[in-house]
């Protein structure tokens, strides 16, 4: 930084000493202290003082200085106005807000200081620019209003995507409000969250948002949630009958959340929030409950390691053709249904498209020409759409009748309903085709966007401009003849306009009517009254034409905006058709079958496959497996077997198949019957939560606790290696207690994988438990995982064999075999599959053990010994050793 550039905070600057422009800047900046101000100066957006310091650091821009009226220059940096979106996007991604301050008049016509004002504030949840948004993902802003009503938490929560006009809302009433709110946040994954002060008391929610999301949190004052403020905002947006229009309950809290959201949008967007025309109310019980842990473990939309799409369920099912369809597919995966009738409507539609190969192919071809009209309509409403984008809307309209007709060929109720919702928008197509040229410019100011014949004045001005060139040629020929100067020519530049240029050798032939304007080394430049008159006519026509084209294009945008609801309904229908066709295409390509979905308690899968792994292993054989779960004889499957054998894959595939069925997709199996599950819970894998100061075991127990508190009889629970994060006896005791609690108190369908082979005896004590294991083929000291699940407990843990496969040194493997043989010889009655901790191994190898203790150990039947008796026995041994 130069020595004469002194960083100053805006609040410390002496306003009176500043230049007029910097006074204007400071006045606007003080109204937006929490945003980085992009202040338009000519062809740049400039930033000053602390904003300049922040932006130069975050955007890696050169920091310079600007004379501002103070003894020292103000810190300054800037970005070109035509590429500001790139820089704004980077700031937004880092959690900043950006206020766009625009010149409100033409600087060339301004008298004195150019008028400037904020046209909008860009925040993470209010982005509409296509270059700043992911095509396949919605960008939601969330508003939460929560309070205690008679010692019980109640919450109104809503989500809106202003780039598409979608809005959703629900009322929450729960004893444990934290998990309920987190579940809703997981459904929509907002990039910005507005909260009222009372939410700060729900530490579970604030911790989740801080540690597991990238959302910007905006704390709104209680004044934003006052009844009068709420009613004014809702009335302004939806009319006096807003409560009926939106379907809000009389005593609900959603209106307060939505009113605060509208107030925030008015503050930041200034205009364009008319895009939100309606609100879709839903009940949290309308969708399958999926905790953040479950969503991550099942890798629905992003992988756990790389946070990538490849390797997820979304990646497998995405055969969509449109951006709208991609966003809808993601939403369906994030929100599986629990209403079997709605699920079956989707499945019937997918089946119809699955069976109609030609229709499906033609439909996908037509959809491939459909533009992202959801987001385009928002830019049209904001007035920021380009002529090329509006022409893309027209091009889309060409294919809408075909989309409608192809969907109508399938007679299922859902496809008939969606085909009827597709509006061909023929009037808009006609208007756009009449108004715009076939290949309009990307930028309106380049001119030439309006089609000939659309407006008489435009045609007249163009004739003048085009004819003007002919007039200039005629005038040049006339002057050459009159003056006898053969090399006389008429030219143009932006400084002098049109001029007559004559070389020095013909200076004596120049008539007195020529008025000298510029002297060159090679000659002189002149004007004449006739040339000046022609110049005014031509240049005036060009300026008037640009102004007129701008006005006509604005009128076109307004006319399209008036049809917003029609376009929005069509976009929603097209998106759903795209997803249904995608499901059908995935089913054909991947050999899926239509599942039977009903309200029974059955999960029966024949030859089920993991939808993702089988695609990742293309060219390799994926071994299918059967599953039978219900709420009576097969409530819980206890699965044993070595690591790497495929237990986790098997359990996850069952959860994914159930979820796929409940979003309306065909599934990877030869047959499948899914009784609707209201929630899927998973506890898979081990990981520390260092950010929260929690160990692996604490994380595991916290997740198990949530499952035991929230699972119902209709849930599907996946538990993998419960209790392995602590000592053997502690872990085994906890695992057994969890199994008993699920069977006795919840009764839900459960897959329980464990290394505690002692648990396999529980099938004798608890109804509904069945033992299964992953088949292994052993030859000498080598093993082969067959990946096939078979009934009965595992007969060995194969830990040493797995260690060998993992690449442990041969010396370690040999020593492990020797220790194992010694242990087996010392404890001949022990179960080979029993998992022993290191202390137990040392005890068996200790040659100083008294013979009385050895005798007691040899007489012990470990297989039938309950955990509590084992602890008492150990205590007696310890006393004997003293």
Residue ranges, per PLM feature:
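ATPase nucleotide-binding head domains, primarily ABC-like/P-loop NTPase cores
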Residues: 49-52, 152, 251, 321-322, ...
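Charged, surface-exposed helical/loop "interaction arms" that form contiguous linear patches used
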Residues: 382, 386, 399, 452-453, ...
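Active-site phosphate-binding and catalytic loops of NTP-dependent enzymes
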Residues: 101, 124-133, 272, 408-414, ...
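C-terminal tails and terminal domains of large nucleic-acid-associated
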Residues: 850-882
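Charged catalytic and DNA/RNA-contacting regions of genome-maintenance
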Residues: 2-352, 361, 365-381, 385-477, ...
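Extended, charged coiled-coil "arm/hinge" scaffolds of SMC/Rad50-like chromosome-maintenance ATPases
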Residues: 437, 520, 524-558
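Long, charged, glycine-rich C-terminal linkers/tails
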Residues: 103, 273-282, 478-491, 585-607, ...
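Amphipathic heptad-repeat alpha-helical coiled-coil/stalk segments that mediate oligomerization
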Residues: 225-235, 288-294, 304, 395-474, ...
């Amino acid at each position: 930084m130069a020595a004469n550039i002194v960083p100053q905070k805006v609040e410390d600057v002496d306003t009176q000493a500043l230049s007029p422009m910097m006074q204007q800047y400071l006045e606007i900046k003080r109204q937006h202290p929490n945003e980085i101000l992009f202040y338009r100066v000519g062809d740049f957006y400039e930033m000053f003082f602390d904003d300049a310091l922040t932006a130069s650091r975050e955007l890696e821009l050169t920091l310079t200085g600007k004379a501002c009226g103070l003894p020292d220059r103000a810190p300054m940096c800037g970005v070109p106005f035509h590429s500001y979106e790139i820089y704004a996007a980077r700031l937004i991604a880092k959690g900043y807000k950006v206020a766009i301050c625009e010149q409100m008049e033409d600087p060339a016509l301004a008298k004195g200081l150019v008028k400037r004002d904020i046209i909008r504030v860009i925040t993470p949840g209010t982005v509409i620019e296509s270059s700043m948004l992911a095509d396949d993902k919605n960008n939601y802003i969330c508003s939460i209003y929560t309070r205690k009503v008679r010692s019980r938490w109640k919450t109104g929560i809503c989500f809106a995507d202003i780039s598409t006009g979608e809005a959703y809302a629900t009322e929450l009433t729960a004893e444990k409000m934290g998990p309920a709110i987190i579940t809703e946040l997981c459904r929509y994954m907002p990039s910005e969250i507005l909260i009222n002060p009372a939410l700060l008391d729900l530490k579970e929610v604030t911790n989740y948002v801080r540690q597991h999301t990238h959302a910007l949190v905006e704390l709104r004052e209680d004044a934003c949630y006052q009844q009068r403020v709420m009613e004014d905002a809702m009335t302004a947006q939806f009319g006096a009958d807003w409560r009926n229009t939106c379907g809000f309950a009389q005593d609900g809290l959603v209106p307060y959340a939505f009113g605060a959201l509208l107030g925030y949008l008015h503050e930041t967007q200034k205009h364009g929030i008319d895009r939100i025309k309606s609100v879709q109310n839903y009940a949290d019980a309308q969708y399958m409950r999926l905790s953040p842990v479950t969503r991550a473990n099942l890798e629905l939309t992003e992988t756990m390691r790389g946070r990538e799409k490849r390797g997820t369920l979304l990646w497998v099912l995405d055969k969509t053709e449109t951006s709208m369809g991609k966003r809808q597919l993601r939403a369906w995966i994030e929100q599986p249904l629990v209403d079997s009738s709605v699920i079956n409507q989707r499945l019937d539609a997918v089946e119809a498209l699955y069976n109609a190969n030609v229709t499906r192919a033609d439909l996908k071809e037509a959809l491939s020409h459909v533009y992202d009209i959801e987001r385009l309509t928002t830019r049209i409403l904001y007035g920021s759409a380009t002529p090329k984008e509006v022409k893309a809307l027209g091009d889309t309209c060409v294919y809408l009748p075909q989309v409608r007709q192809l969907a109508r060929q399938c007679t299922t109720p859902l496809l008939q309903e969606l085909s009827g919702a597709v509006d061909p928008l023929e009037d808009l197509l006609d208007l756009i085709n009449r108004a715009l040229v076939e290949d309009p410019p990307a930028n309106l100011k380049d001119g030439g966007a309006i089609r000939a014949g659309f407006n008489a004045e435009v045609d007249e001005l163009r004739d003048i401009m085009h004819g003007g060139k002919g007039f200039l040629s005629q005038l040049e020929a006339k002057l050459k003849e009159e003056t006898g100067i053969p090399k006389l020519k008429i030219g143009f530049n932006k400084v002098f306009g049109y001029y007559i240029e004559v070389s020095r050798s013909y200076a004596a032939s120049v008539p007195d009517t020529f008025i000298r304007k510029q002297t060159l080394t090679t000659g002189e430049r002149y004007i004449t009254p006739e040339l000046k008159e022609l110049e005014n006519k031509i240049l005036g026509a060009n300026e008037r034409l640009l102004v007129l084209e701008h006005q006509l294009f604005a009128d076109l945008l307004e006319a399209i905006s008036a049809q917003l609801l029609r376009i929005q309904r069509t976009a929603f229908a097209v998106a759903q058709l795209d997803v249904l066709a995608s499901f059908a295409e995935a089913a054909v390509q991947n050999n899926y079958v239509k599942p039977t979905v009903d309200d029974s308690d059955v999960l029966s899968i024949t030859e089920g496959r993991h939808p993702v792994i089988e695609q990742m292993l293309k060219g390799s054989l994926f071994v299918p497996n059967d599953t039978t779960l219900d709420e009576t004889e097969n409530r819980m499957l206890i699965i044993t077997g070595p690591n790497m054998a495929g237990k986790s894959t098997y359990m996850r595939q069952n959860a994914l198949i159930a979820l796929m069925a409940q979003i309306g997709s065909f599934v990877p199996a030869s047959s499948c019957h899914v009784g609707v599950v209201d929630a899927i819970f998973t506890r898979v894998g081990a990981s520390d939560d260092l950010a929260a100061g929690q160990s692996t075991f604490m994380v595991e127990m916290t997740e198990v606790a949530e499952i035991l508190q929230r699972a119902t009889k209709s849930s599907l629970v996946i538990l993998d290696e419960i209790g392995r994060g602590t000592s053997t006896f502690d872990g085994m005791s906890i695992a057994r207690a969890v199994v008993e609690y699920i069977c006795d108190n919840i009764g839900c369908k459960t897959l329980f994988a464990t290394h505690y082979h002692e648990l396999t005896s529980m099938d004798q004590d608890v109804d509904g438990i069945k033992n299964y294991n992953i088949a292994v083929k052993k030859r000498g000291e080598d093993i082969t995982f067959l990946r096939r699940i078979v009934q009965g407990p595992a007969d060995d843990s194969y830990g040493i064999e797995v260690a060998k496969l993992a690449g442990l040194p041969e010396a370690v493997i040999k020593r492990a075999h020797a220790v194992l043989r010694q242990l087996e010889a010392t404890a001949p009655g022990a179960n080979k599959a029993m998992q022993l901790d290191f202390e137990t191994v040392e005890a068996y190898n200790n040659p100083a053990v008294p013979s009385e203790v050895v005798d007691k150990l040899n007489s012990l039947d470990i297989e039938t010994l309950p955990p509590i008796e084992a602890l008492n026995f150990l205590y007696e041994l310890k006393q004997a050793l003293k």
